[in-house]
A protein has these predicted regions:
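Conserved core segment of the aminotransferase class I/II
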Residues: 41-116, 120
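Active-site pre-lysine segment of PLP-dependent enzymes
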Residues: 1-15, 24-60, 72-73
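Alpha-helix capping/termination and helix-coil
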Residues: 27, 119-122
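Glycine-centered flexible beta-alpha turn that most often forms the glycine-rich phosphate-binding loop
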Residues: 21
């Protein structure tokens, strides 16, 4: 419902682009359902840039593995800038990230349960 309100405003302003940072997409509590603006309003896909990575959900903080999806011209421009300003992550980090993203996701629920328990202990 909240995201729908946001996307309704965005649809009234076609000059506004959307940048989402979805790094916590898997670490949600209770009955909260993670959704992106483009999932709620598919007409936003052409002006949405979605960033994500493995540092939070896959406990790979500091490994500097992230990814982005969006309109091809923007991704190409980002690739040109990124390739000139940073170095590549190590191959072992890349393999670990791929394994995390493609493997069983059940452990994430266990992490969320542990986080909730810590919060309750306060």
């Amino acid at each position: 419902d909240e995201m729908k309100k946001v996307t309704d405003v965005l649809m009234r302003h076609p000059q506004v682009h959307v940048l989402t940072d979805d790094i916590y997409e898997h670490l949600v509590y209770g009955d909260f359902k993670f959704v992106t603006p483009a999932q709620v309003e598919p007409n936003l896909i052409d002006r949405t840039l979605t960033m994500n990575g493995v540092s939070k959900a896959y406990a790979m903080t500091g490994w500097r593995i992230g990814y982005c999806a969006g309109p091809l011209p923007l991704i190409e421009a980002m690739t040109n800038i990124q390739s000139q300003s940073t170095s590549n992550p190590t191959s072992i980090s890349q393999v670990a990230a791929e394994t995390g993203l493609n493997g069983d996701q059940g452990f994430i629920r266990e992490m969320v349960k542990a986080f909730i328990a810590r919060q309750l202990k306060g």
